[in-house]
Amino acid sequence: MTSEHKVGEVGTEIAPELAPDADGATRVDLLLRHVCHLARSLTNAEQAALALQATVDDAPRKYFSLSAAYAPWRDYRPDPKGLGLHGLEIPPGEVIRLTQEEVESHPAWQNFGDQAPEHPPMRGWLATAVCGDGGYRYGLLQLSDKSAGGDFTDEDEVRLRELAALVGAALDALRFSHERAAA
């Protein structure tokens, strides 16, 4: 596997796991929602989001976990477009950590574009790519708003990197299982 793949490949490769159950959720959907909650718990972040790249049969997916402080945004669900900071190509295993000042001065910062009036605030940013075997890119895991107004730490970087690697390995297992079954 190479790290370069067409947008749209993931869905076909883990298709059985992406098929909705009776409630409309998939096992992968549930897993990725839990990943966001776990990422928040590991880093004391108020917000976590995971964007899974577009699949052949489906649009890009985005999963969230928000603290009680962000209750007004619980139903905010934009179409993930991968613009601004969200569109940065973070190499596998690397983490980007920005303070609020660094976010606002970053050349990729777009202040949420046309979503600005509805988008929850973003104070600081910690993000890494979720990659599998050989750098195969699944998506982006990102956190914002460290509790108590603090900045993300070196330890937060380590925890996010390790969680993203675990998620990448889990998605690989699903993808490889489907490939073997299809062969």
Identify the role of each PLM range.
Residues 123-132:
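A short, aliphatic-rich beta-strand micro-motif
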Residues 1-34, 38-42, 155, 170-183:
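Signal-transmission linkers at sensory-effector interfaces
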Residues 70-106:
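Acidic/proline- and glycine-rich, intrinsically disordered low-complexity segments
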Residues 140-150:
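Short beta-strand-to-loop transition segments that serve as allosteric relay/switch motifs
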Residues 21-76, 174:
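Helix-loop-beta substructure at the N-terminus of cytosolic sensory domains
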Residues 56-58, 131-137, 146, 174:
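Flexible loop/coil segments at beta-strand boundaries within sensory signal-transduction domains
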Residues 96, 100-124, 145-146:
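Signal-transducing coupling segments at domain and membrane junctions
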Residues 161-168:
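Allosteric cytosolic regulatory segments
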